[in-house]
Structure formats: structure tokens, C-alpha cells
Amino acid sequence: MSLARTLARRAAVQAVYQWQLARDSLPDIERQFVEELQLAKSLYRRHAEGFELSPPEREQLEELLEKFGRSQGTDEVEEEDVTLEQRASQCQVPDVQVGYFKELLHGVANNLALLDAALAKYLDRPIDEVDPVERAILRIGCYEFMRRPETPYRVILNEAINLAKEFGAAQSYRYVNGILDRVAHECRAVEMAARRRG
């Protein structure tokens, strides 16, 4: 599991969520996220090299690390009590595979009918009634099952579960796991059978 891909999925969930709710244009959403990623990398690098950031830059970096950085396991500290230094030391550099982020964002949007049809067989309600965070995660996971056969299904499933734990409601990871596991059995039948045999 590549950290850069994990962070690309994390950014894609947020971008797909934004697209689902606001229906902003994909190029606008993509541009916003790519610009924010570039700014996060630049500010993080300057901070890590010991350069003094201005108060607005520090605030931006804190927000961007929260949005794009992946925590390495923080203590039980209230989010608003975490200083920039603590957050930076507890986060991995926001080194997102931008190409993969773009593929996921556009792949979901361009294959929406196909993805929703594959998911609908296993949903307990219409796709539009699924929580928007869960819906974004399900669509991205389904896209990867269908279009990224080189990525093992367990990686895709585990990443989706982790995203649901991070962004979703308390038990949403169970729902995401149940739906995507069934989709995997359909889309990755050969891989699943080989795993059971071996």
C-alpha cells in the first residue's frame, strides 16, 4: 500500500464529496485541490527546513495538513488544541500522487452510471439516499475494483474502510465494508477464488 496512493484516495474522497454536493465543474474542483496540494507541499517543506512562516501561512499549513496529511497516530488530544509543530510532527508530508487523484475524481464522474448500477445491487436504499461521504467512498472503491485490476482487492477494501472510519459516521465503515466486499466478489471473482484456494 503506497502512502502517496493512500493520500490520493483521501483527497479524492473529499473532491468527489464536494462534486456530489455542489456539482461544481470537475476542472474547477481538480484545480482547487491541486493548487492546495502544491501549497501544502511548499509550506510544509519551508516549515520542515526551519523557515519562519507568517501567521496566515501557519494557519494555512495547519488547515492543509488536516485536509491532506495522514496522521501517524496521535494522542487523545482535542483537534483545536494541537499546535502546528505537533500536527507537522504527527503527519506525513502531503506527498499525494496527483495523477491518481485526478484519475479517481474523473473516473468516478465519467463512469457514474456504471458504478451506481454495480453498487445498487447491494445497497439497502437508492444511491442518492446513501450518506454523501459513504457514497463517495463506495464509488471510488467500486471504480478501483473495476478499473484498477493490478491493485489487490484487499488493498482497495482496507483503504475504503479506513476512509470511512476517518470521514464517515461512527459505524459507516461496516456499511462500506459490507457493500464493497460484495462488489469485490462480483468484480474480482477470479482473484477472490485464487485467494480462497491459496
From Swiss-Prot:
Spell out the InterPro entries in the cross-references: NusB-like_sf, NusB_fam, NusB_RsmB_TIM44
Query: Which Pfam families does this one have?
Result: NusB
Gene Ontology molecular function, alphabetical: RNA binding
Q: Which Gene3D superfamilies match?
A: NusB-like
Provide this UniProt record's keywords sorted from A to Z: RNA-binding, Transcription, Transcription antitermination, Transcription regulation
Secreted found in the keyword field: no
Indicate the family of this protein.
Belongs to the NusB family.
Role: Involved in transcription antitermination. Required for transcription of ribosomal RNA (rRNA) genes. Binds specifically to the boxA antiterminator sequence of the ribosomal RNA (rrn) operons.
HAMAP family listed in its UniProt record: NusB
**Annotated protein name in UniProt:** Transcription antitermination protein NusB
Please name the taxonomic classification of the source.
Bacteria, Pseudomonadati, Pseudomonadota, Gammaproteobacteria, Methylococcales
